[in-house]
Amino acid sequence: MTVSISSYLMVALILFCVGLYGALTKRNAVVVLLSIELMLNAVNINLVAFSKFGLYPSVTGQIFTLFTMTVAAAEVAVGLAILIALYRNKETVNVDEMNQMKR
């Protein structure tokens, strides 16, 4: 039994839509950060799917996915560090209350 490219793309679309919904509607900064990570994972699924089912199947999509995952890990580390610093100053993780970076 083989899985077609449309199945991969449908899973990626659902993941991206859930991530976009969370990023646009939620007010908790941690949830927004996790939603952005969901969107990046949807992109990774697309890269691997197009790499596997392309005209000339290769590992290029998987290499780009590894690079994207590395950048996403750095993004999470920096984002969480900023959130911890903001929480210490403002004592909230609500996005609406974090409109300025000065003390």
Swiss-Prot record:
Q: Does the keyword Translocase apply?
A: yes
* Transmembrane segments annotated in the record for this chain: 5-25, 30-50, 66-86
Q: What is its EC number?
A: 7.1.1.-
Please name the source species: Brevibacillus brevis (strain 47 / JCM 6285 / NBRC 100599)
The subcellular localization recorded is: Cell membrane
What protein name is recorded for this chain?
NADH-quinone oxidoreductase subunit K
Main localisation = membrane
Record field: catalytic activity:
a quinone + NADH + 5 H(+)(in) = a quinol + NAD(+) + 4 H(+)(out)
| Membrane topology per record | Multi-pass membrane protein
User: What's an example Gene Ontology biological process for this entry?
Assistant: ATP synthesis coupled electron transport
GO CC annotation = NADH dehydrogenase complex; plasma membrane
Task: Name the family.
Answer: Belongs to the complex I subunit 4L family.
Q: Coiled-coil stretches, from where to where?
A: none
Among its keywords, does the record have Hydrolase? no
Enzyme class per UniProt = translocase
Q: Which keywords appear in this protein's UniProt record, sorted alphabetically? A: Cell membrane, Membrane, NAD, Quinone, Translocase, Transmembrane, Transmembrane helix, Transport
Pfam families attached here? Oxidored_q2
The role this protein plays is: NDH-1 shuttles electrons from NADH, via FMN and iron-sulfur (Fe-S) centers, to quinones in the respiratory chain. The immediate electron acceptor for the enzyme in this species is believed to be a menaquinone. Couples the redox reaction to proton translocation (for every two electrons transferred, four hydrogen ions are translocated across the cytoplasmic membrane), and thus conserves the redox energy in a proton gradient.
Give the PANTHER family listed for this entry. Answer: NADH-UBIQUINONE OXIDOREDUCTASE CHAIN 4L, NADH-UBIQUINONE OXIDOREDUCTASE SUBUNIT ND4L
